[in-house]
């Protein structure tokens, strides 16, 4: 079904059963939309959690008198997100599964169901906004800096952004919680906020990787200093990350991880090397505003999606055939392959990439 034939008053809302999607449903209904809730049943280490979430979402839908559906996407989620997560770590990278899930699994699933249901709009409870500039939609930071989730949605395409609604983008988490209490949703208002990787169920990611892939999937190798001198052995790159000092198994506890050399399957350590960098190059990136020739594009750069990590001012430059040169005005600490890096002009997301 093409978007031109979809009802402008119907919206497909992703519902997890938690506070944010519950209040998004309420706000959309109060705004006059005909809301259809969809719970995506993703793969989880503890399958019962997903059943509980679906039941909570259904209960909310019944309370609001809106339609509710469940879509089972466990197989595709396992392949594209969980297996990717494990594979990247085993290669010595630091992946962000949310940045993988949103453009590849979650939003395409919402879009598919929206088309099937005749919904012009798709919505979620993310704390972000959007803005139309020069006939192009851009993602924008949420009004509450402490809950802004734009870092995790930087790679949504134009079709999705054009149809997306973000009812919570202008609100703070505290205000949403207050409104939930005032509107009879005490259960979700006091519900503990979920943190971390959704499918780990609180398990350490290293234990999870072994659990999913077995010890035989790990490649033991050498721990070396920056000159290549062998200092010890490791049981797999997945057990290490840049800056790590504990758990190296070396007699001298002054060493820390400088980088993970996946091509040689080595953990490189040092006692004195700096983990700060002023420049990186990206081959896997997207920009809505491309610098031309020698022109530098001034941006604010976010490396991690945690609200306590501020953006760093910097510049972008296209270097052919290498890709995108990212220069930081102030050195950034501990950048590792696999991380997402997002670029902003003021509060507007203009692109991003994978280190």
Regions found by a protein language model. Name each.
Residues 123-129, 138-355:
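AMP-forming adenylation/ATP pyrophosphatase catalytic core
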Residues 1-154, 173-175, 257:
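ATP-dependent adenylation/nucleotidyltransferase module used to activate substrates
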